Design a protein with these regions (language model features):
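Small/polar/charged residue-enriched interaction surfaces, especially the RNA/DNA-contacting tracks
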Residues: 1-330
C-alpha cells in the first residue's frame, strides 16, 4: 500500500469508553403471531444482540481494524397495542426508560447463537520499545509520542494488519518458489484475506484485527537526532524529543470470518498463523523505526484458537495440505 498524493485528511473518532443508547422498533401484525413470524423476528433480533455482544457486528468505518465494537449493557422493552397506543407519544422520552427492567439476559438466551468467526488470541511480550507516533499538539510536549487511548499505549489494528499483510505476501511468494501450487494467485489470496477496492468492485477484509493495549509498559522519554533516510547521515539542527514505551505485554486478538467455502477459511487461517508465528518469534516488526530494533515481540504464552491451545499446527498443516507440491499429488 502506498500513500496517495495530496490525499491527507483529518478524522474524528470516539475513544473507547464512550456511552450512548439507541431505540429500535419491531412492528408486528396480528397475523404474525398466528403464523409464528413474530417469534421468528424476535429470534433474529436476539441474534443481532448476541452478534453485537460477541463483537461480530460493528458499526462505522474501519470495522475490520478494531473500530466500531461495542457492548450492550442493558435492554428495556415496552409493548404498544391498541389498548395503550397513546403512550407511544412518549416512547422516545429518556425519563420513561430509567426504571425499566433490564431484559438483556432474556434476549440473549433465546438467540440460538452460532459464532460466524474463528477467534485467535496471541499473547505477546514487547522486546524493547515501539514507535507508532502521534505528533505534539501542545507547546512543551515531546515532538513525538506513542499512540495512546485514555493514557494507555496501544497498537492499532491497522499497524498489525499492515505488517501481517506484507508478511503473508512474502510467505506465499516463498511457497510458490518452492514448488507449491497455491489455490489462487497470491495477489488474489491477499485480496480475499484483507479486502480490496477496485473501482466499482470491493470486498471487506475477512481478517479482523483489534486494537491492543500495552500493559505494564515503562514510559521512556529520550532526545534524538534526525537522520536523513537518503544519506544515512545526521541532519543539521534536527534534534527532537520522543516519548515511547518499553517492555510491556499485550494480546493480539484477530478473527477470521467463516465463509461459504470451508477450504478458503482453512488456508486463510493457516497462512495467518504462519505470520503470527513470525510475530511471536521476533521475525516480524510492527510500527516505525524498525531498523533500530523497535516493534519486535516475543511469545508470552500459547496461541489460542476459539479458546483452545495447541491447534495452530493443525491449521497450518491443513493450509499446506490444500497446496499441491510438485510430484507430491494433491
Amino acid at each position: 500500500k502506498t500513500a496517495l498524493s495530496q490525499s491527507k485528511f483529518d478524522m474524528e473518532i470516539l475513544e473507547a469508553g464512550a456511552k450512548g443508547h439507541f431505540y429500535l422498533e419491531l412492528v408486528t401484525r396480528e397475523e404474525d403471531r398466528a403464523t409464528g413470524r413474530e417469534e421468528e423476528m424476535e429470534q433474529e433480533l436476539a441474534r443481532i444482540f448476541q452478534g453485537i455482544q460477541a463483537g461480530e457486528i460493528r458499526i462505522g468505518s474501519k470495522k475490520t481494524r478494531g473500530f466500531g465494537q461495542f457492548k450492550i449493557e442493558s435492554i428495556g422493552e415496552k409493548n404498544y397495542t391498541k389498548d395503550n397506543y397513546l403512550e407511544y407519544a412518549d416512547a422516545y422520552d429518556e425519563a420513561r426508560w430509567e426504571n425499566c427492567e433490564n431484559v438483556l439476559k432474556e434476549w440473549l438466551d433465546q438467540s440460538g447463537w452460532i459464532p460466524k468467526m474463528v477467534q485467535i488470541e496471541v499473547p505477546l511480550q514487547l522486546k524493547g520499545g515501539i514507535s507508532i507516533r502521534q505528533y505534539a499538539a501542545r507547546k512543551g510536549e515531546p515532538d513525538f509520542t506513542q499512540l495512546t487511548d485514555h493514557g494507555i499505549p496501544v497498537v492499532p489494528g491497522t499497524s498489525f494488519a499492515g505488517a501481517i499483510r506484507h508478511r503473508i505476501k512474502t510467505i506465499l511468494q516463498e511457497l510458490k518458489n518452492t514448488g507449491a501450487t497455491l489455490p489462487k494467485e497470491y495477489s488474489e489470496i491477499i485480496d480475499i484475506a484483507f479486502g480490496y477496492v477496485d473501482k466499482k468492485r470491493a470486498c471487506s477484509s475477512n481478517i479482523i484485527i483489534n486494537e491492543s493495549e500495552i500493559k505494564n509498559a515503562k514510559q521512556l522519554t529520550m532526545m534524538r537526532t534526525g537522520v536523513s533516510r537518503l544519506e544515512s547521515a545526521v541532519k543539521d539542527g534536527a534534534l527532537y524529543k520522543e516519548k515511547t514505551y518499553v517492555d510491556g505485554k499485550l494480546s493480539l486478538k484477530a478473527r477470521v470470518k467463516k465463509g461459504k467455502c470451508p477450504e478458503d477459511e482453512k488456508w486463510i487461517i493457516g497462512v495467518l498463523l504462519l505470520a503470527l508465528k513470525d510475530l511471536q518469534n521476533g521475525f516480524l516488526a510492527v510500527g516505525g523505526q524498525t531498523a533500530i530494533g523497535r516493534g519486535l515481540f516475543s511469545a508470552d504464552g500459547p496461541i489460542r484458537i476459539d479458546g483452545k491451545e495447541g491447534l495452530e499446527d493443525t491449521y497450518i498443516a491443513e493450509a499446506i495440505k490444500n497446496m499441491r507440491m510438485n510430484g507430491g499429488g494433491k
